[in-house]
């Protein structure tokens, strides 16, 4: 028997949302100082290949590689499901000419994204709303592409996201996801404990396996499903985060002891350390997922 190690997914839905909001509210300065800049506005990992010259390049390259995978064209309507402060939304509007709607449950991210959109003079092409990507108010068949970059992990029920994506996409519309995936279920008690030490620190309830993702997509009519392990391209970015957290950990401990750093902020640092350990133990991988929508007969799910 595998014990339940995750404390996050035993919370109520509203409590889980509150935890996600608290995570991004309280860790924003860490991301701002150590990870992103005004050009990237990215709270995701970078994709390294022969074209990238450093950390910032890899963050932007992630957008390019995913956009190529989805075949995003000028004038297409894209839902950025879990948009953060708008980094990918802005890139898609500027580099691909897309019309983008970004959604996130985090109100402070919506406010920041709107401010950044105004600064970039992109308000005609990008808009942001506070919403749950598993249960939106958008009309059916209203998007050409649904894009999820390291945001699906926060959903308690990944299948609910795929159900809503199938409803929102026009026939022939494309889904593209970049996400952490567990390598097996179950992993065994010690491995599950290690994995969830990371996930709890990042307000993530659990990860699905590649086969679980495929099964959910198939159930809601997606075809041309492709799932690829691209961990090798993410490793430089993962190593960078590990290096940052390893060397900053003593200061984080002191900050927590002094009451300067919150429980959530300290959990983010611990989670980052456990994430790399779990990777080295082969407990998870980083995957690209893409698929094509075939119908619009998914029931309207908004309550």
Regions found by a protein language model. Name each.
Residues 1-34:
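N-terminal auxiliary segments of SAM/dcSAM-dependent transferases
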Residues 22-72:
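Class I SAM-dependent transferase core
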Residues 77-79, 88-135:
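Class I SAM-dependent methyltransferase SAM/SAH-binding core
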Residues 181-205, 217:
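Short, glycine-/aromatic-enriched active-site segment of Class I SAM-dependent methyltransferases
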Residues 159-174:
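A short glycine-rich, Lys/Arg-flanked "PGG" loop and its adjoining helix->strand segment in the class I
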Residues 205-221:
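Short alpha-helix
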Residues 226-303:
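Conserved Class I S-adenosyl-L-methionine
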Residues 134-146:
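A short acidic, Gly/Pro-enriched loop at the edge of an enzyme's catalytic core
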């Amino acid at each position: 028997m595998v014990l339940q190690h995750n404390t996050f997914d035993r919370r109520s839905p509203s409590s889980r949302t509150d935890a996600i909001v608290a995570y991004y509210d309280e860790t924003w300065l860490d991301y701002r100082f150590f990870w992103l800049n005004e050009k990237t506005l990215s709270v995701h990992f970078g994709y390294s290949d022969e074209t990238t010259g450093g950390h910032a390049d890899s963050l932007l390259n992630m957008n390019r590689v995913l956009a190529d995978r989805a075949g995003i064209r000028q004038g297409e309507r894209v839902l950025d499901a879990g948009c953060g402060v708008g980094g990918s939304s802005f890139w898609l509007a500027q580099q691909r000419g897309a019309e983008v709607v970004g959604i996130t449950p985090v109100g402070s991210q919506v406010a920041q994204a709107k401010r950044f959109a105004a600064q970039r003079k992109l308000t005609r092409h990008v808009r942001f709303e506070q919403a749950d990507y598993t249960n939106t108010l958008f009309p059916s068949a209203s998007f050409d592409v649904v894009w999820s970059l390291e945001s699906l992990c926060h959903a308690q029920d990944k299948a609910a996201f795929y159900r809503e994506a199938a409803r929102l996409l026009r026939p022939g519309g494309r889904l593209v996801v970049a996400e952490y995936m567990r390598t097996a279920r179950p992993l065994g008690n010690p491995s599950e404990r290690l994995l969830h030490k990371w996930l709890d620190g990042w307000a993530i309830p659990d990860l699905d396996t590649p086969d679980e993702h495929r099964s959910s997509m198939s159930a809601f009519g997606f075809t041309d499903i492709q799932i690829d392990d691209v961990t090798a391209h993410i490793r430089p970015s993962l190593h960078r985060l590990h290096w940052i957290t390893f060397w900053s950990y003593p200061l984080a401990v002191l900050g927590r002891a002094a009451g300067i750093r919150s429980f959530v902020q300290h959990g983010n640092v611990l989670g980052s350390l456990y994430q790399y350990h779990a990777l080295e133990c082969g407990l998870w991988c980083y995957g690209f997922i893409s698929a094509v929508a075939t119908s619009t007969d998914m029931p309207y799910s908004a309550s």
